[in-house]
């Protein structure tokens, strides 16, 4: 089995004359932010923390906030490297979930964020689209399992998944970015359909 190489020194730097790493093209920036969201959503350490509500009842919101502060690094800095992203993720886990992640799993996530940025810089959205489709499938699987559990029905028909329309892919991806990366608090609805009361103010960085 081959081992994937992880470049701990990976970094990106703003082009000459620019003060940050934001993309001027809205689609480019939206795809990048979606990509960051998808990468962070697949981080096992954070996923476990959210599933077990280690950050309290608003654990899911905290995950989106962590995505936001990683995106903000690129909005505020001229140079962002894997070490900075890794450090940001680890501190956020301690501050928001009281969890000290010691398995080095934050580094591959950080490097993948850098890779996503480079892909978006080159207008290559294949990886972002792949991650988004994988996330959608994971959500469908979770929903199917919930339905089977609630109804107590062992019929495999409950796990049928609707066909995905490729023509709507771009539109759906554009719509999901504001939901996952938002600078303004939006209503948070739990799995049972109840709206959660969000805390006032922003958490510290």
UniProtKB/Swiss-Prot annotation:
It holds the Pfam family WGG. Signal peptide: none annotated. Residues 144-205 are annotated as: Disordered. Residues 152-177 have a biased composition (Acidic residues). Its main location: cytoplasm. InterPro entries: Pre-rRNA_process_TSR2. GO terms for cellular component: cytoplasm; nucleus. Keywords: Cytoplasm, Nucleus, rRNA processing. GO terms for biological process: maturation of LSU-rRNA from tricistronic rRNA transcript (SSU-rRNA, 5.8S rRNA, LSU-rRNA); maturation of SSU-rRNA from tricistronic rRNA transcript (SSU-rRNA, 5.8S rRNA, LSU-rRNA). One of its GO terms (molecular function) is ribosome binding. It is found in: Cytoplasm; Nucleus. Belongs to the TSR2 family. Present with 13400 molecules/cell in log phase SD medium. Interacts with RPS26A. Required for 20S pre-rRNA processing. This is Pre-rRNA-processing protein TSR2. It comes from Saccharomyces cerevisiae (strain ATCC 204508 / S288c). The lineage of its organism: Eukaryota, Fungi, Dikarya, Ascomycota, Saccharomycotina.
